[in-house]
Curated annotation (Swiss-Prot):
Phylogenetic placement of the source organism: Bacteria, Pseudomonadati, Pseudomonadota, Alphaproteobacteria, Rickettsiales
Family to which this protein belongs: Belongs to the TRAFAC class translation factor GTPase superfamily. Classic translation factor GTPase family. EF-Tu/EF-1A subfamily.
Oligomeric form and interacting partners: Monomer.
Gene field: tuf1
Residues binding GTP, per UniProt: 15-22, 80-84, 135-138
GO cellular component: cytosol
InterPro entries membership: EF-Tu_GTP-bd, EF-Tu_GTPase, EFTu-like_2, EFTU_2, G_TR_CS, P-loop_NTPase, Small_GTP-bd, T_Tr_GTP-bd_dom
Catalytic reaction annotation: GTP + H2O = GDP + phosphate + H(+)
Stretches for region G2: 59-63
EC numbers for this chain: 3.6.5.3
Region annotation (G3) ranges: 80-83
Enzyme class: hydrolase
Entry protein name: Elongation factor Tu
Region (G5): 173-175
Length: 395
């Protein structure tokens, strides 16, 4: 960890429209600002969150509000999206990679269509942990009703592959917590109970601890030294003398890293997040190309086929003006390269309209180094028309 900073975790509110996601976000910041000191704890009003600034991720505009808060042990970055379509885009493009999600369900309605859709998407994009905030409990005075809603949510979470029986379900009211004068009030206590549930979530393993992987952006030949490839190290660490594989587009080649450079300085090692140049032993410039990856031996393979969850841009977002059908052949921008591929739609789906999100099967023209959870853009004539995440590799 850098200079004694608190461990950091990314969370987001998910759930059906009008169930109180944004109100909860405001209540979290307000109660924590009253209860705990800390630079990160500033009360954020509902309107500030609701008028979320726009960001771009993979060429797609998404309205997201980022707030932060902290406890004694951790720092949280919290994302809330005002619009339902923004949630889907956000989850698929990974504009904010959530380590954990707070599922907001209204006690008056129970699970609704978007509740299901968000849980399913959370699972597919790799959100490991969920805690549940049952909102609007102040207007339900029937305990049995609350128990039924809780049971329904637990069953739904189990259905989509989460440990429904073990997940924390906190019953509260975001509006009441916001209105309370006292920070020790009964509804504010519920907010603290939710924070305690978040505190129990395992900290994510950051990418440095994973096997080395770097996507090649450029290839140079340096007279007297050999071939250097450059790119951003996606995960892991590379040291001089490490064995590495070159994977994708061609047969796997094995080599050894004989040098690591950053900003024209020689280093002993490069790590996740670094933009580095890697010198490769015995590899000619024409043996390697942009779009391949360097990897720790045996850690990644190249494939042509995969299943994915994709979001297709609307016309107003710069996407297509017309639907597409099965066997549509756009380019897939995977890591650092465009590869043409063929799209197969699910049985019973005739066509995909701009603005849809859909599960597809893809067959690429050339094998590329891919893994489950990898995000990609779909392009046509050099512009992004969709975005996706790989949910399954097809051998």
């Amino acid at each position: 960890m850098v200079d004694g900073r608190k461990p950091h975790i990314n969370v987001g509110t998910i759930g059906h429209v009008d169930h109180g996601k944004t109100t909860l976000t405001a209540a979290l910041t307000t109660v924590l600002a009253k209860r705990l000191s800390g630079e990160g704890n500033k009360s954020v009003k509902y309107d500030e969150i609701d008028k979320a600034p726009e960001e771009k991720a993979r060429g797609i505009t998404i309205s997201t509000a980022h707030v932060e808060y902290e406890t004694e042990n951790r720092h949280y970055a919290h994302v809330d999206c005002p619009g339902h379509a923004d949630y889907i885009k956000n989850m698929i493009t990974g504009a904010a990679q959530m380590d954990a999600a707070i599922l907001v369900v209204s006690a008056t309605d129970g699970a609704m269509p978007q509740t299901r859709e968000h849980i399913l998407l959370a699972k597919q994009v790799g959100v490991k942990d969920i805690v549940v905030w049952m909102n609007k409990c102040d207007v339900v005075d029937d305990e049995e009703m609350l128990s039924l809603v809780e049971m329904e949510i637990r069953e739904l979470l189990t259905k989509y592959g989460y440990p429904g029986d073990d997940i924390d379900v906190v019953k509260g009211s975001a509006v009441k917590a916001l209105e309370e004068e006292s920070a020790d009030g009964v509804w504010s206590e519920k907010i603290m109970e939710l924070m305690n549930a978040l505190e129990k979530i395992d900290l994510p393993i950051r990418e440095k601890d994973k096997p080395f992987l770097m996507s090649i952006e450029d290839v140079f030949s340096i007279p007297g030294r050999g071939t250097v490839v450059t790119g951003r190290i996606e995960r892991g660490v590379i040291k001089v003398g490490d064995k590495i594989d070159i994977v994708g587009l061609r047969d796997i080649q094995s080599t050894v890293c004989t040098g690591v450079e950053m900003f024209h300085k020689a280093l002993d090692a490069g790590e996740a997040g670094d933009n580095a140049g890697i010198l490769l032993r015995g590899i000619k410039k024409e043996d390697v190309e942009r779009g391949q990856v360097l990897s720790a031996p045996g850690q990644i393979h190249s494939y042509k086929g995969f299943k994915a969850e994709v979001y297709v841009l609307k016309k107003e977002e710069g996407g297509r003006h017309t639907p597409f059908f099965s066997n549509y052949q756009p380019q897939f921008y995977v890591r650092t390269t465009d590869v043409t591929g063929n799209i197969k739609l699910p049985d019973g789906v005739e066509m995909v309209m701009p603005g849809d999100n859909i599960s597809i099967e893809v067959n690429l023209d050339k094998p590329v180094a891919i893994d489950k959870g990898l995000r990609f853009a779909i392009r046509e004539g050099g512009r992004t028309i969709g975005s996706g995440i790989i949910t399954e590799i097809l051998e």
